[in-house]
């Protein structure tokens, strides 16, 4: 089973030419991890571009996410089969529940047990969740048992560090993928990150990514520009001191970028 590469290509809000620019250039530069979702409405294009790239499917770690409309009894697996068809593949590396069911409209056990069944049937190699609170993560572990939930994908960056969620995941061996790791570009203007970057000869964005990577997280920034895609990859080589790591931790201010009206409290 392929291990998830620590740096991936996020595809949220990318379609048409921007998606083409991001994926084809990214794969050419050496990215081997693509993150998409049913609600992004770009799975078919992602599949086409993966095929066009010439990179063998088995060399790409592919994640998609099941949308909340597909949680009801008997719906999760057919929705993943549609995703697989669009993506032009017969398996996913990771299938995630995109958000917990709004207001618990569908009981968690209903959709998580279907997701586990999708794994048992070979539709996906690993399963996980996204945007779950600590209470919801506890419930998920109780439903499926220890070790079943392999990943939690959640918004994390220096301005929103989600420490309680991170601690819970670490204690339960749940790997973390940080989405929006640059806070929609807000981190680029942070004086502390710029100052640390100058010290290392790198950008504030690279410092933000390096800070997350140093904590053992996977990051999935999105970019359509070749120079930014290459710079994000180069963040893998940035080594921050323990003092710098601690300084960056002081930037926490609960600044959430992804906050739809159905998000859990």
What are these regions (language model features)?
Residues 6-17, 65-74, 103-105:
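Active-site mouth loops of central-metabolism enzymes
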Residues 76-97, 117-121, 143:
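CE4/NodB-like, metal-dependent polysaccharide N-deacetylase domain
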Residues 14-27, 72-87, 108-110, 135-138, ...:
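Short, acidic/polar
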Residues 1-60, 114, 183, 264-265:
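N-terminal binding-site loop/beta-alpha segment at the start of enzyme catalytic domains
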Residues 44-51, 80-84, 115, 137-141:
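Short, well-ordered amphipathic alpha-helices
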Residues 33, 91-94, 125-126, 151:
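Residues at the N-termini of beta-strands
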Residues 57-70, 91-100, 155-156:
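A short, structured active-site edge motif that brings together acidic residues
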Residues 100-265:
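Beta/alpha (TIM)-barrel catalytic core signal, keyed to glycine-rich beta->alpha loops juxtaposed to Asp/Glu
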């Amino acid at each position: 089973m392929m291990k998830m590469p620590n740096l991936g290509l996020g595809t949220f809000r990318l379609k048409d030419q921007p998606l083409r620019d991001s994926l084809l250039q990214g794969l050419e530069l050496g990215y081997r991890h693509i993150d998409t979702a049913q609600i992004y409405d770009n799975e078919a294009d992602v599949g086409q571009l993966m095929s066009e790239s010439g990179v063998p499917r088995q060399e790409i770690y592919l994640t998609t996410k099941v949308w909340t409309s597909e949680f009801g009894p008997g719906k999760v697996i057919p929705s993943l089969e549609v995703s697989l068809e669009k993506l032009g593949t017969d398996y996913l590396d990771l299938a995630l529940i995109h958000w917990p069911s709004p207001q618990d409209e569908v009981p968690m056990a209903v959709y998580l047990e279907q997701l586990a069944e999708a794994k048992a049937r070979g539709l996906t190699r690993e399963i996980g969740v996204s945007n779950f609170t600590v209470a919801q993560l506890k419930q998920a572990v109780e439903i499926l048992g220890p070790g079943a939930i392999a990943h939690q994908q959640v918004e994390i960056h220096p301005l929103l560090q989600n420490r309680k969620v991170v601690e819970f995941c670490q204690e339960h061996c749940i790997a973390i993928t940080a989405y929006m790791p640059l806070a929609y570009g807000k981190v680029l203007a942070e004086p502390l990150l710029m100052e640390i970057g100058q010290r290392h000869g790198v950008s504030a964005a690279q410092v933000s990514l390096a800070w997350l990577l140093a904590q053992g997280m996977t990051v999935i920034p999105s970019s359509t520009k070749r120079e930014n895609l290459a710079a994000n990859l180069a963040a893998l080589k940035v080594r921050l001191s323990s003092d710098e790591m601690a300084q960056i931790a002081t930037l926490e201010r609960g600044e959430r970028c992804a906050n739809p009206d159905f998000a859990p409290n």
